[in-house]
């Protein structure tokens, strides 16, 4: 029996060898290798053919070896599933599944589906039973067919909406019921439910059944904190809905969330929409509905309250943005219903006081006034309260009665600019006799002050209750003021002056913070026609706080400057600059007539204190604690900054003067001088830092410049190769994640140009095309075969050791398109552990489905029996096919394995396990992953290695040179060969066979073995010839059916011989594949062509027993190839 098995083992090698010889014959001589065929020849057929050959080799593995492999798989699964304690990845995955699975399906597994068709029933009889409480003899009255489950509110609501009560069981049965029970009533519970949820005008209407809410409730969370109840409801939009932002862009609404917060007397609701751009996918515009508005309908009855949210939608293809004038929307007088004028009533409430709206005007003649109104000028009094401190009225104003403010000669109601203190004084006229006939309507003026701004009150018109003589005095005062009083002006950033017509101040108090906002109303200065001597420019506003006892007074002072002084200052400035000269040293002390000093004095001090400035500096400053002053200076600058290399900085100064302290902060920009270096590529960076310690103002400036050309520098984007040890994981991980495979040559590894390659054509296109993800590709493959996906659910796919891709997908109606992913996330976890956690649920359907893809691309469906809820969930209880699929999901596998959770019609969770073949990817250079490359090498995936390998250019001189070729003389190239050992494993052989070597760029070549002895080119050619002879010898042995003698005896299973035969067959397949895929330049010297490492390995393989005399393996050498040459792909 053992002999028969050993005779059958080499059989696949013979057939594969024969097919390979027929399709790709060996050259007659090693000197004349044919040119490689084009890439199009190696299509998917070739890849499937190689995969089928590997499967056939696996079938003919020795039974003992196959049994050992199955035991190793079972041990791996037992090791993963052995610990009962959940890991961090398990908790994260199960939480993700809990959040994205329907919450209403958890814990209620016997509830029928929401859209399950419900057959009709006798609703009237059922309602009567509920009202009377009689449930006897109910079996004979119930129909024998399928009845809806008890308490199905949705089914009862649908029946009440579509059918009348007397027609639910037919007219005859309704008549008999009425005869037996004259006082037949309806379903009170259902009717009340209808009245609470539906408006009265919609009850019983048939079109209501066709209305579908665009929102579908997925989860509801209620939080109760004290008397505040917060409800968060998560909806999903079906069908597709969109929303339009303020800019007109339309976004798809993926999910909607509504937060309701309800307390004692406050109830608020907020809608949150999760959106994505509408152009990111292709959808039919007729299927998209744009949400135009959300309205809330509330209905109140004596004991019933109803609230309904209504979404007003519009089809996307029906939107026509048309600009319509406002005149088209004017209301027609015929459509205005007769009734109270709401706008007029609203205007009255906004403008009139409450006591005038209660009918006080009609009863004014009957009710005597409560208090006699004292005549007075309300405008002057209000002006006094806004401008004068409270302590100024103690000696001038009488308590109890307001005195009328009169005008003295040459004075008006405006301020006078006095040079002594800069304040405005308006004395009160106490000698004006009171006139009993003059009365002021306080309520009217109060209404005016509450509703109208101060500048809009008619100042030129005489008051209706004022005196005629007083009005004449006001006009004369205004005329005299127009010729003598100065005009205040402000200067903008452009240097232009504007006359001030009104000044208003807003004060904002929030907690302990007070803010002031000044607004100036101006007009052009040239329209006034005034002389410069009567124009004062407002330079700053000073806020002065005076505390006297318990009363605090705030005084705002406008500091002005005559316009003529500004012109003199501008004329003196260039004269002073010319007098200094460019070479003269700057004066240490400010001289008389220094423009900068005078300007600083004008900006910080009022005019009345400039004469006493020097004396105040010599003497000790008198500090008054009860007075604080803070000045904001208006320092307009030109829009075009001065172009000069002078140093600009931040200036902070504190000057005590008299009873005030002024702080001035001048922030100016800092220009970057041009670099005078000749290189031009070294950047110059300036970093300015201002440090202000306690009690002292200092300025420090640090300038960091680029190093000189002769100094050593380490660029930020380069990595020194000498400082990196051999096998640095961080270095090569960075290379594989940031550089394309085609640029991983020795120069890029050395760190000269480690720059990320930009994709070609990205600048020409405005929006790049969206790439299909791996999860979407898997869903598309599963959806192509009917019977696999029948409901939306969760997709779990293994991406690598300890990584899972969880995706929530939505399955549209049949004919509406393919499924799409609503949410996708990459989490940590093991697929077998998650499967075991899912199988512990009580609502899992025991009848599962296993989907496997064959070599032809067809999906094979097999039923899968899952353990029940009561089973412990051991490895032995699972299906063998499921065990093999879970074992593939543990490590790095080429095939895509995963699990699909979806809901059945009975509310159960159906599990579908799948294993798909890897699909063909583009040959364009792309960023690779270290895990993907390691998996391809370990598994022997020739197609993936070929798609990721580096292809040399046609010109051998332009190819990248390795580090070894740079250290040897230019006339030689060294190929390092690691011989095979008899204890080499299959994974190591696949690594050596699938690792091509870059072609040498020199004319001559030699082979250096690990023992350090070079081998000439002729022995290398002899080794290749002997390799062919060894292949022929093996072919003859397999054809004759006489295997070699086993050292263990003919009776024992020869495991060593089976391993050698399998190793030889795999090496043959890989050698043939590498020979065809290797590029050989036409017309070049055959000696200079690239020889794959596989050829030398085959020449040195001791399994053949023929070529051991030419090349001997070195004792103690490693069987695995070092990690550094693996990077030269």
Curated annotation (Swiss-Prot):
One of its GO terms (molecular function) is actin binding. Its main location: other. Xin repeats lie at residues 89-104, 121-136, 151-166, 186-201, 226-241, 264-279, 302-317, 340-355, 376-391, 440-455, 511-526, 549-564, 593-608, 625-640, 658-673, 695-710, 727-742. Residues 469-483 have a biased composition (Polar residues). One of its GO terms (biological process) is satellite cell activation involved in skeletal muscle regeneration. Expressed at intercalated disks in cardiomyocytes of the heart (at protein level). Expressed in myocytes where it localizes to actin filaments prior to differentiation and is then expressed at nonstriated nascent myofibrils and Z-bodies during differentiation (at protein level). Expressed in highly differentiated myocytes at immature or mis-aligned Z-disks (at protein level). Expressed in skeletal muscle. Pfam families: Xin. The keyword Repeat applies. Belongs to the Xin family. Protects actin filaments from depolymerization. Required for correct cardiac intercalated disk ultrastructure via maintenance of cell-cell adhesion stability, and as a result maintains cardiac organ morphology, conductance and heart beat rhythm. Required for development of normal skeletal muscle morphology and muscle fiber type composition. Plays a role in regulating muscle satellite cell activation and survival, as a result promotes muscle fiber recovery from injury and fatigue. Interacts (via N-terminus) with CTTN; the interaction promotes CTTN localization to intercalated disks in cardiomyocytes. Interacts with CTNNB1. Interacts with FLNC and VASP. Interacts with F-actin. Xin repeats bind F-actin. This is Xin actin-binding repeat-containing protein 1. It comes from Mus musculus.
């Amino acid at each position: 029996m053992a002999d028969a098995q050993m005779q059958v083992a080499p059989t696949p090698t013979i057939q594969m060898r024969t097919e390979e010889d027929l399709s790709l014959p060996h050259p007659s001589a090693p000197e004349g290798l044919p040119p490689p065929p084009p890439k199009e020849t190696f299509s998917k057929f070739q890849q499937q053919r190689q995969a089928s050959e590997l499967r056939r080799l696996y079938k003919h593995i020795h039974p003992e070896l196959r049994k050992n492999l199955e035991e190793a798989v079972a041990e791996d699964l037992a090791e993963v599933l052995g610990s009962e304690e959940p890991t961090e990845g398990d908790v994260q995955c199960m939480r993700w599944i809990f959040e994205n699975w329907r919450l209403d399906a958890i814990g209620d597994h016997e509830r029928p589906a929401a859209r399950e068709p419900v057959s009709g029933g006798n609703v009237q009889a059922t309602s009567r039973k509920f009202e009377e409480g009689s449930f006897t003899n109910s079996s004979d009255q119930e129909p024998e067919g399928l009845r809806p489950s008890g308490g199905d509110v949705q089914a009862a609501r649908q029946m009440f909406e579509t059918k009348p009560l007397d027609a639910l069981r037919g007219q005859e049965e309704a008549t008999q019921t009425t005869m037996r029970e004259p006082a037949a009533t309806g379903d009170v519970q259902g009717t009340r439910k209808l009245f609470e949820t539906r408006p009265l005008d919609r009850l019983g209407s048939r079109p209501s059944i066709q209305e579908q809410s665009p929102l579908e409730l997925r989860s509801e969370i209620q939080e109760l904190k004290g008397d505040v109840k917060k409800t968060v409801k998560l909806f999903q939009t079906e069908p597709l809905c969109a929303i339009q932002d303020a800019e007109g862009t339309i976004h798809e609404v993926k999910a909607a969330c509504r937060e309701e917060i309800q307390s004692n007397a406050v109830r608020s609701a907020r809608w949150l929409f999760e959106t994505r751009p509408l152009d990111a996918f292709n959808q039919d515009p007729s299927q998209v509905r744009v949400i135009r508005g959300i309205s809330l309908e509330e209905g109140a009855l004596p004991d019933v309250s109803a609230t309904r949210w209504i979404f007003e939608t519009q089809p996307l293809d029906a939107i026509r943005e048309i600009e319509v004038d406002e005149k088209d929307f004017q209301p027609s007088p015929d459509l205005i219903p007769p009734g109270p004028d709401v706008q007029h009533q609203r205007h009255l409430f906004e403008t009139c006081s409450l006591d005038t709206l209660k009918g006080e005007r009609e009863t004014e003649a009957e009710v005597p006034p409560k208090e006699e109104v004292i005549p007075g000028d309300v405008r002057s009094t209000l002006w006094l309260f806004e401008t004068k401190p409270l302590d100024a009225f103690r000696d001038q104003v009488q308590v109890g009665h307001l005195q009328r403010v009169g005008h003295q000669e040459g004075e008006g109601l405006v301020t006078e600019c006095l040079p002594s203190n800069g304040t405005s004084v308006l004395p009160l006229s106490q000698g004006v006799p009171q006139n009993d006939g003059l009365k002021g309507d306080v309520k009217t003026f109060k209404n005016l002050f509450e509703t109208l701004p101060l500048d809009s009150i008619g100042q030129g018109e005489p008051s209706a209750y004022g005196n005629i003589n007083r009005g004449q005095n006001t006009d004369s005062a205004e005329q005299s003021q127009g010729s003598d009083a100065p005009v205040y002006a402000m200067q903008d950033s452009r240097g232009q002056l504007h006359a001030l017509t009104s000044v208003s101040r807003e004060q904002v108090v929030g907690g302990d913070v007070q803010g002031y906002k000044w607004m100036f109303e101006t007009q052009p200065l040239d329209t006034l026609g005034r002389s410069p001597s009567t124009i004062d420019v407002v330079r700053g506003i000073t806020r002065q706080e005076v505390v006297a006892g318990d009363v605090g007074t705030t005084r705002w002072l406008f500091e002005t400057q005559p316009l003529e002084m500004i012109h003199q200052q501008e004329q003196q400035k260039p004269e002073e600059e010319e007098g200094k000269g460019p070479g003269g040293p700057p004066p240490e002390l400010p001289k008389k007539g220094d423009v900068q000093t005078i300007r600083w004095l004008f900006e910080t001090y009022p005019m009345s204190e400039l004469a006493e400035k020097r004396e105040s500096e010599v003497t000790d400053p008198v500090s008054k604690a009860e007075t604080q002053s803070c000045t904001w200076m208006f320092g307009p600058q030109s829009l075009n900054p001065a172009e000069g290399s002078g140093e600009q900085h931040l200036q902070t100064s504190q000057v005590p003067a008299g009873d005030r302290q002024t702080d001035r902060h001048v922030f100016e920009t800092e220009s970057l001088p041009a670099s005078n270096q000749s290189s031009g590529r070294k950047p110059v960076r300036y970093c300015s830092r201002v440090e202000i310690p306690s009690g002292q103002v200092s300025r420090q400036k640090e300038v960091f410049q680029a190093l000189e050309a002769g100094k050593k520098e380490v660029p930020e984007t380069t990595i020194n190769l000498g400082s990196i040890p051999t096998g640095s994981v961080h270095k090569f991980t960075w290379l594989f994640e940031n550089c394309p495979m085609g640029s991983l040559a020795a120069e890029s590894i050395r760190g000269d140009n480690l720059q990320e390659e930009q994709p070609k054509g990205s600048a020409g296109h405005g929006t790049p095309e969206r790439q299909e993800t791996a999860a979407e590709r898997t869903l598309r493959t599963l959806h192509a075969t009917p019977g696999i996906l029948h409901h939306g659910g969760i997709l779990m796919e293994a991406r690598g050791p300890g990584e899972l891709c969880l995706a929530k997908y939505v399955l549209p109606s049949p004919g509406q398109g393919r499924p799409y992913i609503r949410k996708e996330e990459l989490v940590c976890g093991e697929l077998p552990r998650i499967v075991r956690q899912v199988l512990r649920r009580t609502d899992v359907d025991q009848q599962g489905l296993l989907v496997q893809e064959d070599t032809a691309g067809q999906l094979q469906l097999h039923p899968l029996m899952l353990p029940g809820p009561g089973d412990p969930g051991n490895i032995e209880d699972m299906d063998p096919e499921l065990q093999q699929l879970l074992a593939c999901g543990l490590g790095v596998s080429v095939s895509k394995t995963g699990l699909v959770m979806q809901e059945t019609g009975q509310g159960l969770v159906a599990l579908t396990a799948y294993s798909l073949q890897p699909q063909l990817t583009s040959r364009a250079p792309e960023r690779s992953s270290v895990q993907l490359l390691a998996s391809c090498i370990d598994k022997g995936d020739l197609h993936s290695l070929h798609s990721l390998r580096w292809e040399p250019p046609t010109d051998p001189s332009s190819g990248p040179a390795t580090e070894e070729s740079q250290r040897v003389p230019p006339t030689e190239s060294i190929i390092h060969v690691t011989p095979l050992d008899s204890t080499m494993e299959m994974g190591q052989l696949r690594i050596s066979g699938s690792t091509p070597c870059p072609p040498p760029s020199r004319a001559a070549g030699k082979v250096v073995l690990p023992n350090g002895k070079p081998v000439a080119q002729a022995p290398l050619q002899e080794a290749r010839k002997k390799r062919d002879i060894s292949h022929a010898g093996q072919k003859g042995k397999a054809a004759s059916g006489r295997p070699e003698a086993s050292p263990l005896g003919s009776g024992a299973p020869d495991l060593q011989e089976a391993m050698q035969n399998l190793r030889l067959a795999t090496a043959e397949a890989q050698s043939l594949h590498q020979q065809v895929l290797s590029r050989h330049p036409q017309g070049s010297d055959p000696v200079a062509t690239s020889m794959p490492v596989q050829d030398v390995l085959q020449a040195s393989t001791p399994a053949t027993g023929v070529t051991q005399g030419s090349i001997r393996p070195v004792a103690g050498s490693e069987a695995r190839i070092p990690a550094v040459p693996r990077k030269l792909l």
